[in-house]
Amino acid sequence: GPGMVMRAEPVLKAIEKAISKIKDKKKVKIINFSPSGKKFTTEYAKNSVKKYTDIILISGRYEGIDARVKKIFKAEDISVGDYVLTGGELPAMILIDCMSRQIKGVLGKFESLEEERVSSSEFYTRPEKLVYKGKSYKVPKVLLSGNHKLIEEWKKGK
């Protein structure tokens, strides 16, 4: 192939070391990042957080990691999108952030977890009227009304 493949031995040693520190080895999930893997979703994150106490992430580089590592540890291939990155570090960060949000107490407010937030596209703050290069941009009147029902309807319409 066009790039180097990471050797199995150092990765195997790292995974063994991580597993040795885990008490309940039956609740461990090992994930390998791959553009051809199962698509990572919020639903996947929720289910994983409920089912596993520990998750080990394999973040490859170059062409990837020796395939025997995945076979030995039954690692699941996960993809964060239909594109190729230079390594698994960014997918690991995405997974960690999304899964962490699912753990009680991580977020300050439960509302921060709402799935509806994914569909919210516009947010406003002060001042009510913003002037930029001679042009005025105003906060929509409905948001200033204080009428929560109308505001929710406006949000759903966006």
Regions found by a protein language model. Name each.
Residues G1, I30, G60, P140-L143, ...:
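A residue-level signal for conserved active-site and pocket-lining positions in enzyme catalytic cores
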Residues P2-I19, S145, K149-K158:
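N-terminal nucleotide/polyanion-binding subdomain common to many enzyme families
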Residues M4, L57, S79, L143-L144:
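Short conserved micro-motifs on helix faces and helix-strand junctions that flank
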Residues V5-R61, D66:
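S-adenosyl-L-methionine/SAH cofactor-binding core of RNA-modifying enzymes
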Residues K50, K71-I72, S136-K138:
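Short hydrophobic "helix-edge" motifs at membrane interfaces and signal-peptide entry regions
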Residues I65, V69-S112:
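Structured adenosyl-cofactor binding patch, chiefly the S-adenosyl-L-methionine
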Residues L90, Q102-K141:
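Internal, active-site/partner-interface "lid" segment
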